[in-house]
Amino acid sequence: MNYIPTQTFYGRRWRPRPAFRPWQVSMQPTPTMVTPMLQAPDLQAQQMQQLISAVSALTTKQNVKAPKGQRQKKQQKPKEKKENQKKKPTQKKKQQQKPKPQAKKKKPGRRERMCMKIENDCIFEVKLDGKVTGYACLVGDKVMKPAHVKGTIDNPDLAKLTYKKSSKYDLECAQIPVHMKSDASKYTHEKPEGHYNWHHGAVQYSGGRFTIPTGAGKPGDSGRPIFDNKGRVVAIVLGGANEGARTALSVVTWTKDMVTRVTPEGTEEWSAALMMCILANTSFPCSSPPCYPCCYEKQPEQTLRMLEDNVNRPGYYELLEASMTCRNRSRHRRSVTEHFNVYKATRPYLAYCADCGDGYFCYSPVAIEKIRDEAPDGMLKIQVSAQIGLDKAGTHAHTKIRYMAGHDVQESKRDSLRVYTSAACSIHGTMGHFIVAHCPPGDYLKVSFEDADSHVKACKVQYKHDPLPVGREKFVVRPHFGVELPCTSYQLTTAPTDEEIDMHTPPDIPDRTLLSQTAGNVKITAGGRTIRYNCTCGRDNVGTTSTDKTINTCKIDQCHAAVTSHDKWQFTSPFVPRADQTARRGKVHVPFPLTNVTCRVPLARAPDVTYGKKEVTLRLHPDHPTLFSYRSLGAEPHPYEEWVDKFSERIIPVTEEGIEYQWGNNPPVRLWAQLTTEGKPHGWPHEIIQYYYGLYPAATIAAVSGASLMALLTLAATCCMLATARRKCLTPYALTPGAVVPLTLGLLCCAPRANAASFAETMAYLWDENKTLFWMEFAAPAAALALLACCIKSLICCCKPFSFLVLLSLGASAKAYEHTATIPNVVGFPYKAHIERNGFSPMTLQLEVVETSWEPTLNLEYITCEYKTVVPSPFIKCCGTSECSSKEQPDYQCKVYTGVYPFMWGGAYCFCDSENTQLSEAYVDRSDVCKHDHASAYKAHTASLKATIRISYGTINQTTEAFVNGEHAVNVGGSKFIFGPISTAWSPFDNKIVVYKDDVYNQDFPPYGSGQPGRFGDIQSRTVESKDLYANTALKLSRPSPGVVHVPYTPTPSGFKYWLKEKGSSLNTKAPFGCKIKTNPVRAMDCAVGSIPVSMDIPDSAFTRVVDAPAVTDLSCQVVVCTHSSDFGGVATLSYKTDKPGKCAVHSHSNVATLQEATVDVKEDGKVTVHFSTASASPAFKVSVCDAKTTCTAACEPPKDHIVPYGASHNNQVFPDMSGTAMTWVQRLASGLGGLALIAVVVLVLVTCITMRR
């Protein structure tokens, strides 16, 4: 069957369901203007007809003729007498129904009211044995019921339909009867993200999932529809999966062409299954037991035994409620104090307390059993032996405390209850055995109250209370203003919860005061109680009595008496023995559950920030210890953190890669350094040197030192060559007596004139005498000139490219092929490519990564959390031995101790000559806080990268999501794009990770089943509720102290709590490449690593034909202002001429500069302004507008701001860039020094040649 309903409607919305007619309605159409004739009915039938007419006017707008014979069949009572008396109650009933809406205590919200209007028509209850198990919904032309909901639809027409079942969608479907099609609701496949409506309020739809606040839905809601604001059905609820604060719904919904079923992990079906209990091998519904001993007030002891027999059944609490309220197949009126009824089957008790406030032990009526401190807001949940909020009769009384005084239950005023640590605590809530109080830090805990005689009863235990605050600030007082962070707290509600405590039958309480000596006889005074006695004098002096009894010829020391009472439960305390060895028990709900809430935490005062050159100075003013941390956003994060508790000043180095710092609970701040410096790149030599020294001090010192050394060497060499030439010129004349130096040589060498052979004569002599030497003399100066020319040429050729070396691998504006490109995996870094195609105008393609997400494939090994040691009440075998039996409990320990002689407040517990034995048990279980506070151990596998990329070309500007794997194709504006795989196989996650709340840790952990005591993983389970709990806590039992009933044990401290203290910094604060670590699901966001290859197929339709595009001519560029190393700090004006106005693609064809604009509007003989970003001081880049190209040349100045809160949008440099002015000065210096050197070389060569000729 097709599970997509057909939209069949009859022009109606939200109309009430027609009333049930006691006759069969004829389905033949009748004329609209004809009014059927009715015979005169009786008064009751006349009233019914009036009601039917009113309803029909609201629904079908037609009147239907009722057959006479069938109308007389439908009478609720067959009696025909006293018709006038029947009429009066009917009128009275109608009068009572009018004010009924005003009597509602809780008015439904707008969403609930809207759903109630629609649901009144389109949903029907599904019942099994009279109990509602779910709902069926009329959608379109079909009736749909979840297949897992057992029962029959509560409508005779729908119940007899033939349904077809689909296990794939968990639905049963049938065609709606024709006369009910007007009741059906519309449906829609349109589901924009937002909020929708259902029976319990708002439903949030996001990411393809429907979620509700936890607790808003429950079993029994299966089949309820979800509506949009127009009243159309968008989904049908099947179940839910608890995910902490919210519950994900399992639904059947529709897309445009098909039906889909959304089933979150851990989904439970929400069918209200009928719970069955047993009694004497007979099954019965737990909510309505048919047996006689099912009311506690009538037969308390038998009722408790029945509850103990069903304690492990799912319907136990329904049976408990039915037993306490004594309802048996009858309507029960609920009460706001109904959950207190269970306490009438329990009683307070006296228990051993080591310190009753005065340093001595006692059996205290307010003994402290447990203290829980899982809430980080300083709240404590304390369990005591007294019961609060109840009077001594067991009824609810908020101002009373009932406690055990001997064998009797007494009551006192609740106002006298006190809780202390280092100071008095503030009590926020009390119920039964539990107190919720906010306490200051301290080393002990004390609970006290005044009894009926105004005597203080107290108990004091050693307890270290030092709550850890939420967030990154250790504050003490809740602030007036701050930020809300997720946390846990004890909810102040006494309604039933998921937590529970075990109860058991109390033991026999020995009391020596019941025995009195009278003339050699022992008298047992019952006092209205049941006494179990045992006397060793005589025979058969063992038994129970409820009246006074005398044991003849006996002494008190030979008798033992104890009060026995098995019609009440009491808490399973390790300080009170249990009545028998069998594990018979009951259980009751625990109030004040731990729930997820938000806590207001303070915001540290913002630090005083001073920006310097590549550093930032923070002056911190903490009001309390505050965490300060920072990390680098590059490949090496170098994380740092410390707790600051006084005024401090911290200097953080800032690089071009960026840093992130966080102060207290303030949001993290990211900063990037800019290439700021003193001096000018286009000024005098000393200004240029100052400019480059500020940017690259080491390289500048090396370059200036090298240039200075070269200049000095060149000058020294020039002087040396000139001196050598002079010496060679004067030497012949100095050795020849009476020689006269020629006039020219004398002027050059400052020497007397002399005669010598001319150059021509010298060369002629060498030609005649030695031709080899002649050619050597001629070749030497020529070789020197050639060598000098090559050096100068090489220097000029090397220096010019030196000013334009950039990181080409991250080019954001490089021209790409038509079908391939490589974009940097950096969020916000624009990539632009110029695409040319024959016959079309060039087009600029822009790709920008908006968001990236690395999601590893995770395999949950186990969860671990804090454990609790469960210590049942010990079993004491008087005058005999007992044996341990194995139990399927984690880390179960059992020991039997002989030779024990326990005492209770009324005397010795045992009375025999042989030894007594005590059976002590203990085992480990998950703490109640595990649902909210646990760590998950995962094995991480290959991470997949998902990216959100903004694609712009032509008139298309769209953002799309794609998996970067080289296979997933996305379609944007008719173009096909395939991204990936990424250039580097990298992931911030190790093979083993631990997830705790919103933090992720790269940490090794033991495998499942191999935990060590006191370490992470000492307890392990697959989920927080699974039955596969493993524990290794080195739990050990010890021998009880003489005369005391207790179960001493020594557990190893929780490994989970130890791990919380020693876990160190999370990956959130030290991930490389600026990754933002998120959970649910675990992922790393916006990691700036690697490059993403892109394959694309762009159709011709995306281009503009040449004949349709403007023809741009006379394009010229003038740079108005330019600031390099700043985000689009350059402004250029492009002047042009064109034949017609239109849009043109503008693009930079060089990696030196990145343009901000992709397209511009051109007009005839106009100008356009573009912005560009560059890292060069003297950029020269080619710009094209449509088909025209020109070159822009700029002289850029350094930025003024040292630190900015955004990253650069241009390419970084590998080597220092040299400005055009600096190159000019270098060329001038090289030319001057080179000229001097050339002159010296020429002179030396000429002199050498002349002297060698002689």
UniProtKB/Swiss-Prot annotation:
Residues 271-694, 757-771, 815-1231 are extracellular. A lipid is attached at C719, C729, C749, C750, C1249 (S-palmitoyl cysteine). Residues 164-169 are annotated as: Interaction with spike glycoprotein E2. Residues 95-123 are annotated as: Binding to the viral RNA. Residues 60-113 are annotated as: Disordered. Residues 43-77 are annotated as: Host transcription inhibition. The active site is at H148 (charge relay system), D170 (charge relay system), S222 (charge relay system). Keywords: Capsid protein, Cleavage on pair of basic residues, Disulfide bond, Fusion of virus membrane with host endosomal membrane, Fusion of virus membrane with host membrane, Glycoprotein, Host cell membrane, Host cytoplasm, Host endoplasmic reticulum, Host Golgi apparatus, Host membrane, Host nucleus, Host-virus interaction, Hydrolase, Ion channel, Ion transport, Lipoprotein, Membrane, Palmitate, Protease, RNA-binding, Serine protease, T=4 icosahedral capsid protein, Transmembrane, Transmembrane helix, Transport, Viral attachment to host cell, Viral attachment to host entry receptor, Viral ion channel, Viral penetration into host cytoplasm, Virion, Virus entry into host cell. Structural polyprotein: Specific enzymatic cleavages in vivo yield mature proteins. Capsid protein is auto-cleaved during polyprotein translation, unmasking a signal peptide at the N-terminus of the precursor of E3/E2. The remaining polyprotein is then targeted to the host endoplasmic reticulum, where host signal peptidase cleaves it into pE2, 6K and E1 proteins. pE2 is further processed to mature E3 and E2 by host furin in trans-Golgi vesicle. This is Structural polyprotein. It comes from Ross river virus (strain T48) (RRV). The lineage of its organism: Viruses, Riboviria, Orthornavirae, Kitrinoviricota, Alsuviricetes.
